[in-house]
């Protein structure tokens, strides 16, 4: 039974990822004692700008930038030991204390070399029909988890069990690689030797994360649950099959961190003031003209992990409405408002025409979304700069009107507005922890 009152917040991307979650988690981390990753892997990067210096985190929660904050990698994450240790070394080289403040769930599924081999071979075989995976083994690792053949972090410390499980799973994957995908097999000895070499460095950070989070809640500590990707990439609720391999909605924080759902009191939905998407998949409000190019250029829309250019389009309020419902969004944070500065007019998606009928929420499935024609509403733009503004009243009148219309279309209040990449370039209307 929880003895003291804590407040816990889930931060969720409401679009197709890349909404600016890293900056907001970093900013909110000043109000918490723990930050938790609960799904995904090292396929998505969170970009932070601290005092003008760029930092990209792929696995480690963004709270690591704050002294006194403990960071947790929950059981819902698929973990590449090699990628994690490399990221730790990069942060330590920058002067951060990481290992004493990072805990890794002992029951995380491992990403191993054969997952990467399968991922890359599949994409190569699909050619133009590819989904656009990052090729880091995320999907195949989740497949092993669901098929109950995965190796987990705790297996690294039982070599005999590791060998037994590896032989079984590699027999399966090598058959797929050689007989179906036409690729080279993966050596069991190489996989084992690499994993065993990395295990000692990982061992001091391995914990029962679920139990430790429960203790923090009993002590009244505030926790922040950091989502990766975005709700429209959710394996169930996204534009399937152009989705990621995990559940990235707010409800996944409970299962992916091992906490009860009653512990999640507030859900902050992060959304850009426009819309972007990486890779393949339908995108109703996409702009393939000079305005789309302008948004990409000013917004620096390139993937933080892959470097791939992002497709850009107008804000899609009907897609966001789907995310609001899926996640139980308490309040929105609008990021990159400044990218819209200087546009004479701005379009805002309010729904779709599907087979001649108006729909005010994103349909399910890629085929249905591909047939949806965006219904756009035109609003006046603004010429004044919004960069670095920290008071809502100082925003241009038309910028405020735009934000108010976004909130109206989506049916949820705006609590935060980001006007630049630095953590201090933030307008606070209601603080998720203090409001």
UniProtKB/Swiss-Prot annotation:
Entry EC no(s): 6.3.4.4
Residues noted as binding GTP in the record, renumbered to the chain: 17-23, 45-47, 310, 336-338, 418-420
Keyword Nucleotide-binding part of the UniProt annotation: yes
GO terms for MF: adenylosuccinate synthase activity; GTP binding; magnesium ion binding
Catalytic residues in the record: 18, 46
Biological or metabolic pathway of the protein: Purine metabolism; AMP biosynthesis via de novo pathway; AMP from IMP: step 1/2
Subunit structure: Homodimer.
Entry protein name: Adenylosuccinate synthetase
């Amino acid at each position: 039974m929880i003895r003291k009152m804590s407040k816990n917040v889930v931060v969720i991307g409401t679009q197709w990822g890349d909404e600016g979650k890293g900056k907001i988690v970093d900013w909110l981390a000043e109000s918490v004692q723990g930050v938790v990753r609960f799904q995904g892997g090292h396929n998505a990067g969170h970009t932070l700008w601290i005092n003008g210096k760029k930092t990209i985190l792929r696995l480690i929660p963004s709270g690591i930038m704050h002294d006194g904050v403990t960071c947790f990698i929950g059981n819902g994450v698929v973990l590449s030991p090699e990628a994690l240790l490399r990221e730790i070394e990069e942060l330590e080289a920058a002067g951060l204390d990481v290992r004493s403040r990072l805990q890794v769930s002992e029951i995380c599924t491992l990403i191993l070399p054969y997952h990467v081999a399968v991922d890359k071979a599949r994409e190569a075989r699909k050619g133009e029909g590819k989904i656009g995976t990052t090729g880091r083994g995320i999907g195949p690792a989740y497949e092993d988890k669901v098929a109950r053949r995965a190796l987990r972090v705790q297996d690294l410390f039982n070599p005999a069990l590791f060998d037994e499980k590896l032989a079984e799973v590699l027999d399966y994957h090598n058959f797929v690689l050689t007989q179906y995908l036409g690729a080279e097999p993966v050596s069991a000895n190489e996989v084992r030797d690499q994993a065993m070499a990395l295990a000692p460095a990982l061992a001091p950070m391995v914990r029962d994360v679920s139990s430790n989070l429960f203790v923090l809640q009993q002590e009244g500590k505030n926790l922040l649950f950091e989502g990766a990707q975005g709700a429209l990439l959710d394996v169930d609720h996204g534009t399937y099959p152009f989705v990621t391999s995990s559940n990235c909605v707010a409800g996944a924080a409970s299962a992916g961190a091992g906490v009860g759902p009653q512990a999640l009191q507030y859900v902050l939905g992060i959304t850009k003031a426009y819309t972007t998407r990486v890779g393949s998949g339908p995108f109703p409000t996409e702009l393939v003209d000079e305005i789309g190019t302008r948004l990409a250029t000013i917004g620096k829309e390139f993937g933080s992990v892959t470097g791939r250019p992002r497709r850009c389009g107008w804000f899609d309020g009907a897609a966001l409405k789907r995310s609001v419902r899926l996640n139980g969004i308490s309040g929105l944070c609008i990021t990159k408002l400044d990218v819209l500065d200087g546009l004479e007019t701005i379009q805002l998606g309010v729904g779709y025409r599907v087979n001649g009928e108006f729909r005010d929420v994103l349909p399910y499935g890629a085929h249905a979304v591909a047939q949806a024609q965006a219904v756009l509403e035109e609003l006046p733009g603004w010429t004044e700069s919004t960069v670095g503004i920290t008071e809502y009243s100082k925003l241009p009148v038309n910028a405020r009107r735009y934000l108010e219309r976004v909130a109206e279309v989506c049916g949820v209040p705006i609590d935060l507005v980001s006007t630049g990449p630095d953590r201090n370039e933030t307008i606070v209307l209601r603080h998720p922890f203090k409001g």
